[in-house]
Amino acid sequence: MKYDTSELCDIYQEEVNVVEPLFSNFGGRSSFGGQIITVKCFEDNGLLYELLEENGRGRVLLVDGGGSVRRALIDAELARLAVQNEWEGLVVYGAVRQVDDLAELDVGIQALAAIPVGAAGEGIGESDVRVNFGGVTFFSGDHLYADNTGIILSEDPLDIE
């Protein structure tokens, strides 16, 4: 499904929070949306492997990497796993790598920047926790919508149809 965050903001202005414009699109899907699962991890993507193994249909993985752009939390291998398990998208408050490969995959990926250095894989981090970045507080179960214009968040799903 295609999402237009500008249109959604016009219709649901009082019901959405708008994330500050910090993110760029790296995935092959220009827009995506779904119910979020929150993750907090710093320069370590081991926990992301576990979560992306789950069925992601209708879900978006929201990763608080502390804003670090020293190590990429998402690479082509993880993005392929997201596609395989039907995740709608990934939002990473951190970095990604292998961007040419990411752009070819049918998954939304928004992140701060790209860097060639990979993350550690020790599995350090926590999921289903409150995270805050970009002027917005995110909880697992909230609904996120993203496109090339921006990212918005709603406590409840928006009536798109």
Curated annotation (Swiss-Prot):
Family label: Belongs to the RraA family.
NCBIfam families: NOT-MenG, PRK09372.1, RraA_entero
Assembly and interaction partners: Homotrimer. Binds to both RNA-binding sites in the C-terminal region of Rne and to RhlB.
Function comment: Globally modulates RNA abundance by binding to RNase E (Rne) and regulating its endonucleolytic activity. Can modulate Rne action in a substrate-dependent manner by altering the composition of the degradosome. Modulates RNA-binding and helicase activities of the degradosome.
Organism expressing this protein natively: Cronobacter sakazakii (strain ATCC BAA-894)
Record flagged with keyword Cytoplasm: yes
InterPro entries: RraA (IPR010203), RraA/RraA-like (IPR005493), RraA/RraA-like_sf (IPR036704), RraA_gpbac (IPR014339)
Gene Ontology BP, a term: negative regulation of RNA catabolic process
Sorted UniProt keywords: Cytoplasm
GO MF annotations in UniProt: endoribonuclease inhibitor activity; enzyme binding
Superkingdom of the organism of origin: Bacteria
Protein name, UniProt field: Regulator of ribonuclease activity A
Disulphide bridges: none
Location of this chain's protein in the cell: Cytoplasm
Keyword Membrane listed: no
Gene Ontology cellular-component terms listed: cytosol
